[in-house]
Amino acid sequence: MMEERQSPVSGENHLPDETSEKRTIRPVKVGSVLLLFFLLVIWPLSSYLLMKGQQPQLSATGSQGIDLSTQIYLPTILIELFVFLLITLVLRLERESFSSIGLKGFDLRNLLIGALFWFGMSLFLMLTSYLLRSYNLSTSPDVLRLLPRTTPQRSLWIMMATSASLAEESAFRGFVLTRLNLYLKNWWLTILIASISFSSGHLYQGTAGAFFAGIYGIFFSLLFLWRKSLVPCMTAHFLQDVTPLFSPLS
């Protein structure tokens, strides 16, 4: 799965099994490099600071102290959509297709694989959480106060989960993995960097929350390299994000 094979680099050929040591070095594209820096550094840092800035107010007053819809959910949705628009803009400027970042394979098989992946990962992380608790590495309790309380809030939460599954998978799996590896030429290093960046944006959830996000990032990356499609990753990501609506302790 992780081996490189020959194929020219264009369009869909950014995907994992289609690189080659014998091809000519791909010229640096400024748009891709700037977007990689934004996705790997700026976005995770800004997400962390945004959520961290709300925690003192959450700790002091609970969810009643802030308007979850306007201060958390809507800003998050807008940021996710902005990121996806940036990816779209860079793809258009560089004359690339959405399929070049894995936005293809919208079929029942990939949907089912994504659902099964989510179920398996949920069981794995549930068992892992018991080990983390023994070392007092629990998720920040303030995070639970971000969960919706009303029907309109739940609707926004679902919209937020949808936008996150689209934007974050397109960014950290689709764009970062395919573009960064063109320069690093090492899938394991590429996966590690992408997963650390993905994890750092979840530090506001505490050590355990960031750890789980990093683990998810690694397995999402492997799933993407296997299926060469973001559909299973987006499906699993969406299910993971909406699960707290039915089981807050998850």
Regions found by a protein language model. Give the residues of each.
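N-terminal, membrane-interfacial amphipathic/helix-forming hydrophobic leader that caps
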Residues: 1-100, 245-250
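Hydrophobic alpha-helical transmembrane segments
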Residues: 33, 73-74, 111-116, 154-158, ...
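Juxtamembrane helix-loop-helix connectors linking adjacent transmembrane helices
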Residues: 55-73, 95-164, 182
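Hydrophobic residues within alpha-helical transmembrane segments
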Residues: 78, 116, 120, 163, ...
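Hydrophobic/aromatic residues in alpha-helical transmembrane segments
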Residues: 124, 128, 163, 176, ...
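Active-site His/Glu-centered metal-binding helix of metallohydrolases
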Residues: 166-171, 175-176, 200, 204, ...
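Membrane-interface helix/loop boundary segments of multi-pass membrane proteins
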Residues: 167-193, 222-229
